[in-house]
């Protein structure tokens, strides 16, 4: 039997797309690893994710046939292969899925015929090495394989409901308990009888002899709530074929880690770590994880302590720990990126564009974890040595909280040693910390609308895009002290819900409007407007006069000046976001914001501090767009239309079928439901007031606009002038004068240190003569005015050299505080411990301290007790010398 032809991974990709393009398919780019509009899914884990809305009928595409190579990730959440990666032949965090799709066009006959043609005629796989499965009642697929393709019945396996329920089968696909579903047929490659394992459906099907290549799903039914299947009017086809396992077959190797892409990455990891054994499992882990980490960063995810960013952090740290296991103590992981770009950059140009960003983000995380990895491993070793089979949950939490060890990393290490982590104990410790954080963060009780009340209300109609005041606002709900009421009176604190309102409810970072509601004989001062249940605007305020009841009709007007200042800041955040992405890179994503009348705050993903030069460029770019005075356009459109329009959606946000797109010239296009200026020039001036870190991988910029920015600049100029006056010059001379002042200060500090050293030298010479002899040991316990801890240590060293066998206590007093140093030199060290002596003294002056047997440090309060404590030192020493 002739061996099949050999194909590179790159050629397999291009062959697949070219083949289906020739069959009339539109070639669709891979979707990002972060699903664009599915908050229920952590990562894109299959080819069908980007077409989900098409299959559900919620979206129409311009084509009915499609083919793609989809990058996928399975790590975290329901689909998690992380623990198996590196230890099995075919598990990966990142993988590529080849797929062809029919949306109500061709069906089983063409799907089966084309799959067979590609496998046997293009890639030359021997037909007698292929086996197929079908759902046990799918006679159409069975007959197509037997009669059209010519596969013997002995190599067509019927698979029934093998998962304990009707239609619960390896060969029946369903998106959920109801909705589109249908049978599938799978194609397997037979590695030969020299490999252990049986065919699918047999007791030993989990062996490695028969490997699934391709799954063809035929969506032909709509499953009803009662479990019955109704035929779909336009059946669809969804196929998926794992590139890595197909490449293993076409390259004549048995594991995915032996294919060309992985061999190149493993080779690079080998060179960086100095490990020559290319089958080493840790090298496999590193090779797998560099792909997952790099493409996550390409798709806008950065390491953090929550959500997708935390999954990325876990994968990076797992790779770093495997490097540590190999004895690597230098930074290495980010150096894998150029090799990955060489291998996959042609297929994914976005990887080439983001290469520098990927390398910098990985390096920053590598440097961060390197600081705690060694210490954390020592803690783990200590815990493991004291435990039999279980790592206590409290210790696993300490490794997570203090040393940055994700719990699955700790579990990974434990498993290698035949141990396990007490996950219940870990979750208990984690929840206890969450409760502490929640308690610390509480500033007032939350109020929710009762479900029965929500059921009777229609979503509030927001009028505030066009109007600042409105009449005929009907009161549809009224809360007092968090409970629904029919009536409230003057002095009552209330939340008023009307059917319509010009008041913006806090969302998207923009604060809620304040203002006034009024009606016949009633006036309500609105301090804030909040959104309840995502769709009801609640006016939070106090009834100033009169009484209010359900059904009343009100007029309302917002605080126009407050709203005016707020919209300047909101529009500026959009320009700032665009400028950050232009200057720092497209990895920048909004992570949070506050848009208030007096300032704006913008949190974003970035892995290192922003330099002063970068900050200046960002500010200049925003102000340039302000001066350009672009018209601000608002468009309402379907979600997909908005994305095609170039609108930026925020990762993790859930959007409706129709969205509001805000466009500022050609500079910024984002989805946004907030209120904004008409032209960018309305912002006037944009001024950054601060920049700093919020958490790992998240930075924060605060800024002011309009009159607030002018006021800020004026205050800065006033302070500059005041500083110039203090320095005896004008503002243009400040830098030179401050530099001269700093140089003078440094010179004086050096002179002061020199004088202190001379003083200490002279003082120690005099002190030596005052030593008390206690059983042949010289004892000194004195107070030294103006001596800090450093000067005390220097004096201690001189006295030890001068006195020989000695016990010395020095107290430096300054500003009501006392620094203490105790030393034991020579023969007394066996009986007198410096740490115990210092603790004895410190306890008498309201302080504490400790240290080694020969040297200890501490401190306390200055006062009469110090003299008494020092006077008692000779007696204490005598007692301990025996």
UniProtKB/Swiss-Prot annotation:
Cellular component terms (Gene Ontology): cytosol
Enzyme class, broadest EC rank: ligase
GO MF annotation: an example: zinc ion binding
Superkingdom, taxonomy of origin: Bacteria
Enzyme Commission identifier(s): 6.1.1.7
Record text on cofactor binding: Binds 1 zinc ion per subunit.
Protein name according to UniProt: Alanine--tRNA ligase
Organism whose genome encodes this protein: Xanthomonas campestris pv. campestris (strain ATCC 33913 / DSM 3586 / NCPPB 528 / LMG 568 / P 25)
